[in-house]
A protein has these predicted regions:
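Arg/Lys-rich, positively charged N-terminal/basic patches that mediate binding to nucleic acids
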Residues: 1-44
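GIY-YIG nuclease signature motif recognition
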Residues: 11, 47, 83
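Structured catalytic/translocation cores of nucleotide/phosphate-coupled proteins
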Residues: 34-37, 67, 115
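A short, surface-exposed loop/turn module that caps and links secondary-structure elements
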Residues: 48-75
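Enriched for short, Lys/Arg-rich terminal
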Residues: 71-80, 84-115
Length: 115
């Protein structure tokens, strides 16, 4: 049996924020609103596909033991995924998804209550 990807509570909000950011960026760059909506939604779907693909190679990415033991992060097409792997339960727990030029290390520290 393979690993299962599980989203922590804040991940859906992360994806909504990314969607909003992308939508605003596309509109600012001149896209019509309907096209900006479609492009942002497609990009978020792509991020979700990349997130689900972590089930196939759960031990990829960089360990971040300075933040918390077992924490990993990996960047895929400008989306940064923070996650933990539970080998016993065969779960990849997605803790956060950040996008592009954000200070993602500071943001994960805040998310985990370490600041």
């Amino acid at each position: 049996m393979g690993f299962k990807v599980v989203r922590a509570a804040g991940v859906d909000t992360d994806l909504e924020l990314i969607n909003d950011h992308l939508f605003e960026s596309y509109v600012d760059l001149g896209d019509p609103i309907s096209e900006a909506v479609d492009r942002a939604a497609a990009r978020v779907r792509s991020i979700e596909t990349d997130m689900e693909a972590l089930m196939h190679s759960p031990y990829q990415g960089t360990l971040s033991p300075q933040i918390t033991p077992g924490l990993r992060h990996v960047t895929k097409d400008k989306a940064i995924f923070y996650f933990e792997v539970d080998n016993v339960r065969q779960i990849v727990l997605i803790l956060a998804v950040f996008f592009s030029g954000q200070d993602h290390e500071q943001r994960i520290l805040e998310r985990l209550g370490r600041t």
